[in-house]
Amino acid sequence: MADNFDRTADERIEFTTSKEVTVAPTFDDMHLKENLLRGIYAYGFESPSAIQSRAIVQICKGRDTIAQAQSGTGKTATFAISILQVIDTALRETQALVLSPTRELATQIQNVIMAVGDYMNVQCHACIGGTNVGDDIRKLDHGQHVVSGTPGRVADMIRRRHLRTRHIKMLVLDEADDLLARGFREQIYDVYRYLPPATQVVVLSATLPYDVLSMTTKFMTDPVRILVKRDELTLEGLKQYFIAVEKEEWKFDTLCDLYDTLTITQAVIFCNTRRKVDWLTDKMREANFTVSSMHGEMPQKERDSIMQDFRQGNSRVLISTDVWARGIDVQQVSLVINYDLPSNRENYIHRIGRSGRFGRKGVAINFVTSEDVRILRDIELYYSTQIDEMPMNVADLLG
């Protein structure tokens, strides 16, 4: 069910917003199309989350919008609903374009748009790298109301004139901080140049570093701002621990000791490099542990089937790089292990946010060598949080 996050945690989120932003307490108050409302309720949403109740009406009015939202707060549905409200399904042309940093996220967004727009006969295509270009060309030539994609492939399809931009009225940049961190700036600017001058721009980002704000000034006119108060990007409900490992080499034995605990539910283990993911996966398998792994170098088909197995619960332990850390919605994950602490502290909340899916309880365990102590302290300071040494009864915490 879509509507299974913790409402009380949601209600506690405090925002600083532009003065014209009001709160719509129900979806009915938003004056949405009848068939869209049917789709929203059929999808499992009962009432809007904090970000939805503030942002949807502003986006539907055509305002450029910057919304600060973490994974799991209902942000994907925020722009999915807004897009479905403003497009004209009688016109078989692309009217909204969503760019996101990973193929998995782009596909997940496509799934949400198709599901919520189920009664509207909407056409939405995921235009992503690593897939057959011929399929893209066929789908786009056929006509799609919405395209959800990664910047490189989208820019390519626009340049080849298969993705027609003249009817586009909304550009959504999801996980904008990560789009820029992954070096997509040039492709985003390329795409933007092809869009009609009056295109509305909606930016969603968990953090708002300088480069995100500088991009918004180039793309946006008098944007509405819906920002979570700094200290409310919360790690609430997540228990965070560290295990002191004297040397890097000892991390592996520590992980093996924890394996039985990991499989109580599902766990994700993060490493900082693709090479480390492959190395750890091989080593775990040699020791007869069942694990699956995923990183950005894998062919798209393989990544899709690994994600599907994990979503369906067929695999219990997934080893990954940060490619997985943004926005991938797997409800059962309640344990995250940072085998390596993230090199970028802003990724910490994305990684462990995976374990608490917005108000769901979760446990995060950080492996810390003596060299890592400084990074751990930096993370604690940055998030005003406390990370304690792990107690012996970690299995009880997951019960």
Swiss-Prot record:
Q: Name one GO molecular function term.
A: RNA helicase activity
Q: Where is this motif: DEAD box?
A: 174-177
According to the entry, every stretch annotated as the Helicase C-terminal domain falls at: 237-398
Q: Which Pfam families match?
A: DEAD, Helicase_C
The UniProt entry, under InterPro entries, shows:
DEAD/DEAH_box_helicase_dom, Helicase_ATP-bd, Helicase_C-like, P-loop_NTPase, RNA_helicase_DEAD_Q_motif
Which cell locations does it reside in?
A: Nucleus, Nucleolus
Q: Which reaction does it catalyse?
A: ATP + H2O = ADP + phosphate + H(+)
User: Which EC number applies?
Assistant: 3.6.4.13
Q: Which GO terms describe its biological process?
A: rRNA processing
- Provide the Gene Ontology terms for cellular component: nucleolus
| Annotated keywords | ATP-binding, Helicase, Hydrolase, Nucleotide-binding, Nucleus, Ribosome biogenesis, RNA-binding, rRNA processing
What does the record give as the function of this protein? ATP-dependent RNA helicase involved in 40S ribosomal subunit biogenesis. Required for the processing and cleavage of 35S pre-rRNA at sites A0, A1, and A2, leading to mature 18S rRNA.
Q: Which family does it belong to?
A: Belongs to the DEAD box helicase family. DDX48/FAL1 subfamily.
- What protein name applies here? ATP-dependent RNA helicase FAL1
Q: What organism does this protein naturally occur in?
A: Coccidioides immitis (strain RS) (Valley fever fungus)
Q: Recite the lineage of the species.
A: Eukaryota, Fungi, Dikarya, Ascomycota, Pezizomycotina
